[in-house]
Design a protein with these regions (language model features):
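Helix-turn-helix DNA-binding module
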Residues: 107, 111, 123-140, 154
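A short pre-motif secondary-structure segment
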Residues: 116-120
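Arg/Lys-rich amphipathic alpha helix in sigma70-family domain 2
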Residues: 49, 60-81, 95, 147, ...
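C-terminal edge and immediately downstream basic/flexible tail or linker adjoining helix-turn-helix-like DNA-binding
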Residues: 4, 133, 150-187
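Internal acidic/polar
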Residues: 68, 76-102, 126, 168-182
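Structural recognition of an alpha-helix C-terminal capping motif at a helix-to-coil junction
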Residues: 32-39, 43, 52-64
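Residue-level preference for hydrophobic side chains embedded in well-ordered alpha helices
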Residues: 8, 12, 16, 20, ...
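A short, charge-rich alpha-helical start-of-domain segment used by transcription regulators
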Residues: 1-18, 28-31, 42, 54
């Protein structure tokens, strides 16, 4: 493994874990998914063209691995298991309820919208990067994020409006500060 490839791989691991958590909604499954995606990337390292978007390449590998695993698991069971530890945290009961409500709302979003929202809002991906990582058109990526924001606003505030990236990031940061745990891990 070349130094640059290795450095990029190490740097992207936290963002891959966030994406994996948004897809699997389970910490152990997310860790397994990231590990499998890294193994796949190492095996396919020769196919990566230096100078191209490494982040999009890795997110695509992770997403494809998730889809493959999902197809295999479809025959044996459902992956909709959310461990109680995903909702646990330190802080007042009310604050935990707010985090739980946000996590439940995120979990109710369709997988493609949840993934798009996490990658754009939490990880700061551009719409172009999101489109490349998920294999969809830029317009589709934008509409997924828009629909996810609007649906969250409806569920959380009881009104149909769009949550801006700034509002959503601010809400997540306030929740993180109150509870003292990474909110993205709850998704």
């Amino acid at each position: 493994m070349t130094g640059s490839f290795h450095d990029e791989m190490i740097a992207i691991l936290p963002r891959l874990r966030v994406q994996a958590l948004s897809l699997t909604r389970n910490r152990a499954a997310a860790d397994d998914l990231v590990q499998d995606a890294v193994c796949n990337a190492l095996a396919a390292q020769h196919s990566f063209t230096p100078g191209t978007n490494f982040s999009a390449w890795m997110h695509r590998i992770l997403r494809n691995r998730f889809i493959s695993d999902l197809r295999k698991k479809r025959e044996t069971g459902n992956i909709e298991d959310v461990p109680a530890s995903a909702m646990a945290g330190s802080g007042a009961h009310e604050e935990r309820l707010v985090v739980k409500e946000l996590a439940e709302a995120m979990n109710r979003l369709p997988a493609d919208q949840r993934e798009a929202l996490v990658l754009v809002v939490m990880q700061g991906m551009s719409y172009d990067e999101l489109a490349a990582a998920t294999g969809c058109a830029v317009g589709t990526a934008k509409s997924r994020v828009f629909r996810a924001r609007r649906q969250l606003a409806t569920w959380l505030y009881g009104e149909e409006r769009d949550l801006s990236t700034v509002e959503l990031r601010g809400a997540v940061q306030r929740l993180r500060a109150r509870v003292g745990e990474p909110v993205a891990a709850s998704f």
